[in-house]
């Protein structure tokens, strides 16, 4: 099971990009996305509408505390994979990640707190260049599922 945690959503600034994170997560094989940061019922309803119209068991929810989400998933035995341009190259780590049955993928919006890097089992870089968290999520899911998403 792949779950995605979107950190630090800002309703005015991130509505579109956070929606795209949910759409990519759903389309490329994740089971759910959890948003943290500012509450944004429109965002959650928008992704739920896509699930209703296009089908599938995908879940979307909001949790104020990202720390609680990470702690909960660690207790459930999930591996925590944080996507960051400062991580290990995806090419060198993806085989290990694929062996993990349950993975929580963490993607940022605003500046990611240093604590996330420490809590993660893997800090993974899709490239060492700045780019979109949507792109990083898409590449990770594609690589995790070996193109069979």
Kindly label every feature range from the protein language model.
Residues 1-85, 145:
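RNA substrate-binding interface of SAM-dependent RNA methyltransferases
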Residues 80-84, 107-108, 127-128, 148:
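Glycine-rich anion-binding loop/nest that anchors nucleotide
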Residues 87-126:
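Long, charge-patterned amphipathic alpha-helical coiled-coil/hairpin "stalk" segments used as oligomerization
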Residues 18-20, 48-50, 94-98, 119-122, ...:
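Short, glycine/charged-enriched secondary-structure capping and boundary segments
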Residues 116-149:
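Structured adenosyl-cofactor binding patch, chiefly the S-adenosyl-L-methionine
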Residues 43-44, 66-70, 90-91, 113-114, ...:
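Short, well-ordered alpha-helical microsegments
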